[in-house]
């Protein structure tokens, strides 16, 4: 995580195909209309800051298609690894 303006942000690189595929597999975001819509939604909003996403927004607005909260995922941008925040 990184502190930006006093808040913790979770790194997520939407330009990385591995990360985009992971989002697809998770089925994240209400009214999900494909990864391009997701990227537009995030980059056009205040939750997207230097490739970091506010985990409070993740928990509030992002859910699995089955309705379960997605939780906070942590992504290692350098290695391209994705880790479940709860593990």
Predicted region positions:
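Structural boundary micro-motifs
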Residues: 1-87
